[in-house]
Curated annotation (Swiss-Prot):
A Gene Ontology BP annotation from the UniProt entry: mRNA catabolic process
Cofactor(s) needed by this chain: Mg(2+)
Descriptive protein name: Polyribonucleotide nucleotidyltransferase
Catalysis performed (reactions): RNA(n+1) + phosphate = RNA(n) + a ribonucleoside 5'-diphosphate
Annotated keywords: Cytoplasm, Magnesium, Metal-binding, Nucleotidyltransferase, RNA-binding, Transferase
Gene Ontology CC annotations of this record: cytosol
Pfam families recorded: KH_1 (PF00013), PNPase (PF03726), RNase_PH (PF01138), RNase_PH_C (PF03725), S1 (PF00575)
HAMAP family according to UniProt: PNPase
Entry keyword annotation includes RNA-binding: yes
Residues noted as binding Mg(2+) in the record, renumbered to the chain: D495, D501
Gene name for this UniProt entry: pnp
SMART domains assigned to the protein according to its UniProt record, in alphabetical order: KH (SM00322), S1 (SM00316)
Length: 722
């Protein structure tokens, strides 16, 4: 097959799509290039359906090869290790964007693999993986209702930029990655520095318009490769008569169950209804062995129809009766309670409860040594702010093995971390590494948003001087014809009902983090603005409830947190603190019980739970790095005698010269007549030249001590010591 290329311009960048050159045995493969960044995306779908499952078996893996940036992995085996957080989050973004577009009921196991094979240090590769996944699926025979395309939208100096470079992103006050089709925004994930809802809507519509050429390029690529027909498959059976019978037997019972407020009571009743349904069908078929056997064989199908009844009833209840589970209105938020400082030895802690969702959150303050070090394509990255989200099985009353965090937990943690990162103080004002851990104690929807709220409370309890409090809210939108219902603070039952599910975090002034999944077309600007406005109202209500526990950060950090003091020294004196083989700094830390971190610019951070220990370490460092001041008198030690003068150590690592003419106000024939090695001598600094060489005077120091000016005293000159 001859390689086929199509190009599209997105903003200032040209994106190349190429197929037919590599990975030709995959069912679809596309080479995506922007600048010198290249991602290879492949898709393969099994020939046979996977039995015994009730979900679409899709796997997405995004991987960054370090050779793409000319780097050798730093691991022992010099191979890439477990997925980084960015790889996991990008895999989730591709999955969330593509999964809803596969044909309903498609049962074949499908895998998307996106591999970064070249990285130019300017153009990020996650958007290329997203577009490449759609393109590879679009030109394959896999039943996929695409195409879609990915784009990153930034706002730099008030102007929107499509696919900004890494340098532009560093200056942006808005940074979102999104996927869009011709008539709908499909997925949104990103953060911002307290931008308004209006700006966010403008950004999303700008992004949707920016991908049109990319969509055309994918269509052209499919046509050029022969417009391969989609493979046939047997969709799930839809027995209308059986479906209606299930509805008739369960509708009123489901209605009664959803009137119950308590989650476990409601779930228990819904489970009983399912059992009653199967029993009723068996009793109806009593005496007919063939019908009984059919019911047993179709039990999974019957349960599916029952789930459809629940889904249909809840949507009708919301759109027709304007009523939700528990009797709440569309904009009503569950009862909120907050508590801080409940863990006595923790640097900062909170317990945030909203309805039946609860998060226990702890904040720990660490030093620069506690920063997370991550090897990425851009080099070694150091993270000084982290939020880790944990979802133990007891939070939903289940029994499961405790394992390492899954993709969902990593994704929820990243969303909450992004929301709070925007209000964290800069390192020069708060030189701590900050780790937040959110453990979900119970869950009935919006647990990631509870982590945002609880995380903010624990930061303030820890005395972290955040810019402003942050809250998060999970929203849902249901659209039935012209009827639209926007739900604030959705429950777990409502989570999968919506045509648009979105989470918005921010301060009272604006949005700091957003996540959206939109499953339908026709979501207009007006609907987006209305949805985000309702989310803003809910967010401000939650902030008010949080303020009842703590409204501003504590004035001081916990007594159990390390005290960090940063001092500055001249960079050339760093070697004096470290010493040969690190001997000096090890001695200081051992004797004072402190942790010391030195930056290349001469910033020295000393940390210890005891301020007295910090001061002791500072004193030792100052003694090693103090500078001679012009006009100041010191008691030094003679280290070497020469014909022209004597070299005197003022303090460790700092020597000066007393010229023979500066030894006495009388003529000195030989230096050794006045001084001897090892002798202590009073001297005055009379000059320091640009090279740092120090001139000393014994005669001026003695005269000053005697209260008179010596004859022929030298004028002090030179540059002050730095």
């Amino acid at each position: 097959m001859t390689p086929i290329q199509k190009t599209a311009r997105v903003g200032a960048q040209e994106i190349l799509l190429e197929t037919g050159k590599v990975a030709k045995q995959a069912h679809g493969s596309v080479w995506v290039r922007m600048g010198d960044s290249i991602v290879l995306v492949t898709v393969v779908s099994a020939a046979e359906k996977k039995e015994g499952i009730d979900f679409f078996p899709l796997t997405v893996d995004y991987q960054e090869k370090l050779f793409a940036a000319g780097r050798v992995p730093g691991s022992f085996f010099r191979r890439e290790g477990r997925p980084t957080e960015k790889e996991t989050l990008t895999s989730r973004i591709v999955d969330r964007s593509c999964r809803p577009l596969f044909a309903e009921g498609y049962p074949n196991e499908t895998q998307i693999i996106a591999t970064v094979i070249s990285f130019d240090q300017e153009n990020d590769t996650d958007v290329l993986a997203l577009t490449g996944a759609s393109a590879a699926l679009h030109l394959s025979d896999i039943p996929f209702n695409g195409p879609i395309a990915g784009v990153r939208v930034g706002r730099v100096n008030g102007q929107f930029v499509a696919n900004p470079t890494l340098a532009q992103r560093a200056e942006a006050d808005l940074d979102v990655i999104m996927a869009a089709s011709r008539d709908a925004i499909v997925m949104v994930e990103g953060g911002a520095k307290e931008v308004s809802e209006q700006v966010m809507v403008d950004a999303l519509l700008f992004g949707q318009a920016a991908v049109r050429e990319l969509l055309d390029a994918q269509d052209a690529l499919r046509k050029a490769t022969g417009d391969k027909p989609r493979r046939a498959f047997d969709p799930p059976k839809n027995d209308v008569a059986l479906r209606e019978k299930v509805k008739a037997l369960t509708w009123e019972k489901v209605k009664e169950a959803y009137a119950r407020n308590e989650k476990h009571d409601r779930y228990g009743r819904l489970s009983e209804i399912k059992k009653e349904l199967l029993q009723a069908l068996k009793e109806e078929a009593a005496g007919d062995a063939q019908k009984l056997a059919a019911i047993a064989l179709r039990e999974k199908e019957i349960k599916g129809y029952y789930e459809d009844v629940k889904y249909e009833y809840m949507r009708k209840m919301i759109t027709d009766e304007r009523r939700r589970i528990g009797g709440r209105g569309e904009a009503d938020i569950r009862k909120i309670t907050s508590e801080v400082g409940l863990l006595p030895r923790v640097h900062g802690s909170s317990l945030f409860t909203r309805g039946e969702t609860q998060a226990l959150v702890a904040t720990t303050l660490g030093t620069a040594e506690d920063e997370q070090r991550v090897e990425m394509l851009t080099g070694m990255v150091f993270k000084r702010f982290m939020l880790h989200y944990n979802f133990p099985p007891f939070s939903v009353g289940e029994v499961k093995f405790l394992r390492s965090p899954g993709r969902r937990e990593i994704g929820h943690g990243a969303l909450a971390e992004r929301a709070l990162r925007q209000v964290m103080p800069p390192e020069d004002k708060f030189p701590y590494t900050v780790r937040i851990v959110s453990d979900i104690m119970e869950s009935n929807g919006s647990s990631s948003m509870a982590s945002v709220c609880g995380g903010c409370l624990s930061l303030m309890d820890a005395g972290v001087p955040i810019k402003a409090p942050v809250a998060g809210i999970a929203m849902g939108l249901i659209k039935e014809g012209e009827k639209i219902a926007i739900l604030s603070d959705i429950l777990g039952d409502e989570d999968h009902l919506g045509d648009m599910d979105f989470k918005v975090c921010g301060t009272a002034e604006g949005i700091t983090s957003i996540q959206m999944d939109i499953k339908i077309g026709g979501v207009t600007r007006e609907i987006l603005e209305r949805a985000l406005a309702q989310a803003a109202d809910g967010r401000k209500h939650i902030l008010g409830e949080m303020a009842k526990a703590i409204a501003t950060p504590r004035e001081s950090i916990s007594a159990y947190a390390p005290r960090i003091t940063t001092i500055k020294i001249r960079p050339e004196r760093i070697k004096d603190i470290i010493g040969p083989g690190g001997k000096t700094i090890k001695d200081i830390t051992a004797r004072t019980g402190t942790s010391i971190n030195i930056e290349d610019d001469g910033s020295v951070s000393i940390a210890s739970p005891s301020q007295d220990k910090v001061e002791a370490a500072i004193k030792m460092i100052r003694s090693l790095t103090q500078e001679a001041e012009i006009g100041k008198t010191y008691l030094g030690t003679v280290r070497k005698i020469a014909e022209f003068g004597a070299f005197v150590e003022l303090f460790p690592g700092t020597d000066g010269l007393i010229h023979i003419s500066e030894l006495s106000d009388k003529r000195v024939k030989s230096v050794s007549d006045v001084l001897s090695e090892g002798e202590e001598v009073l001297v005055k600094v009379i000059s320091v030249d640009r090279a740092g060489k120090i001139r000393l005077s014994r005669k001026e120091a003695l005269a000053e001590a005697a209260g008179k000016k010596p004859e022929g005293a030298a004028e002090t000159k030179g540059e002050p010591a730095k």
